[in-house]
C-alpha cells in the first residue's frame, strides 16, 4: 500500500490526488513534536507547563462553546469537523466513522501537542531525579493524580480519543506515567 502509487498487476501506476488523505498518524506526530519543541524551547519548563494547561482548558472551552447544542463532544457535534473539512477538503478527510471526520485533524492536534509536552516534562523529571525509588514514587503519585483527574474530568468533558479531549490527554498521560513508574 502506498498513498501515491498502486500496482495494477504489471506496473506501478500513480494514484489521483483527489482522494488522498492528507493528515494521518505520522503527520500528527510530526506536528506535535514540532510545536511542542517550539513551546519547550521558548517557554522552558514552567512556560511549557503553563502553555499546556492553557491549551487544554481553551480546547475544552472551544469544544463546549463551539460544538453542536446538546452533543458538543460527539463526532457529529464536534466543532473541529467543519473547520478541518474547510481546511483540508472533504475528499481528504477520513470517512471510516460514517461521517467525514479526521481523528488526526488540525483541530484535535493541540491536545495531542500537550501530551508531547507532558512527555518532555516526565523525561526531564526522570533525568533530574536520577534512577532511585524517590523518582519512581514521584512518578507513581503523578500518574495516579493525573489518571484520577482525567477520570473525574470525564464527568463533564468525556474521555474521547477520536477528538482527543483534554480529559483523554490527562487520563492517558497518567496511565503512561504509571506504566513507567511500575
For each feature predicted by the language model, list its residue ranges.
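Alpha-helical transmembrane segments and their immediate juxtamembrane cytosolic regions
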Residues: 1-182
Amino acid at each position: 500500500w502506498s498513498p501515491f502509487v498502486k500496482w495494477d498487476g504489471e506496473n506501478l501506476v500513480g494514484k489521483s490526488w483527489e482522494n488522498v488523505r492528507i493528515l494521518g498518524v505520522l503527520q500528527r506526530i510530526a506536528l506535535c513534536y514540532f510545536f511542542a519543541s517550539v513551546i519547550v524551547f521558548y517557554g522552558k519548563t514552567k512556560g511549557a507547563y503553563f502553555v499546556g494547561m492553557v491549551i487544554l482548558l481553551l480546547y475544552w472551552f472551544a469544544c463546549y462553546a463551539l460544538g453542536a447544542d446538546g452533543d458538543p463532544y460527539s463526532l457529529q457535534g464536534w466543532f473541529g469537523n467543519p473547520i478541518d473539512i474547510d481546511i483540508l477538503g472533504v475528499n481528504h478527510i477520513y470517512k471510516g466513522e460514517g461521517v467525514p471526520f479526521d481523528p488526526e485533524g488540525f483541530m484535535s492536534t493541540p491536545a495531542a501537542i500537550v501530551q508531547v509536552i507532558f512527555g518532555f516534562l516526565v523525561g526531564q523529571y526522570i533525568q533530574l531525579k536520577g534512577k532511585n525509588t524517590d523518582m519512581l514514587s514521584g512518578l507513581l503519585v503523578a500518574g495516579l493524580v493525573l489518571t484520577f483527574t482525567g477520570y473525574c474530568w470525564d464527568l463533564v468533558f468525556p474521555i474521547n480519543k477520536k477528538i482527543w479531549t483534554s480529559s483523554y490527554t490527562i487520563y492517558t498521560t497518567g496511565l503512561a506515567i504509571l506504566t513507567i513508574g511500575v
